[in-house]
Amino acid sequence: MIEIRRVDNPEYAEYFEWIYRKCCRALKHSEAAAFVPVEKKQNANSSFFSESELKAIGFLKYGKNVLVSRKASIYNPEQMVLGDNIRIDDFCILSGNIKLGSYIHISAYTCLIGGTKGIVLQDFVTVSSRCAVYAVSDDFSGEHLNNSMIPTAYRRVIEGQVILEDYVSVGTGSIILPGVKLEEGVAVGAMSFVKHTLERWKIYVGAPCRYVKDRNQNMKQLRAALQNSDAYEESR
């Protein structure tokens, strides 16, 4: 049709310009184009879920300034409690019983498997990228079959609550097994393997992890300063 009009109408360019303007006028006055919700515009440009989308996910409870990536995977959200000022990055997996305090960052590709015993992250906790925290696991000794597709009669499931207390920092690529507690102020270096409770305000590294040195406790003073600041009041 276009080629025919080129032959029959030497002014075909003006014809197409007329068509273009007519379509623009029709689109401008259409109801669909006239009403675009503000939230929808914002959502399209955001990598995090909006307030209404967070509500639709079905968390048991969540606080203010909660940033959950649209690329994160959340399973059993009805078992999860999220405090204030939380960020969960791309490709994280959260499953089962999980309780997060406030001022928490869970970095990309990190996995938290809460099971029924649960994972608790208190306040000011950082879990770096590609970490795995398990409150439930299988017996790998060979005495039992293992993986989630095996009937429970043929498995030995190992469960234990995992707790990361205030100010805990976990370095990239680290693994934490069921039943472990990282006491207040513990720092775990990159690529560490944690299978037992770690003592407060100490730095550990390695696989299995070992004590390196005591950790500076200045974070406590900085927390107090933050909580007395205008930024803290605005975030509540």
Where are these regions (language model features)?
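C-terminal segments of enzyme domains that contribute to small-molecule binding surfaces
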Residues: 2-45, 52, 145-178, 207-236
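Short flexible/disordered coil segments
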Residues: 130-137, 189-196, 232-236
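C-terminal/domain-terminus segments
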Residues: 81, 86, 176-212, 217-226
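Flexible, glycine/small-residue-enriched loop-and-beta-strand segment within the central core
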Residues: 72-82, 87-178, 207, 215-216
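N-terminal segments that cap or nucleate solenoid repeat domains
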Residues: 41-76
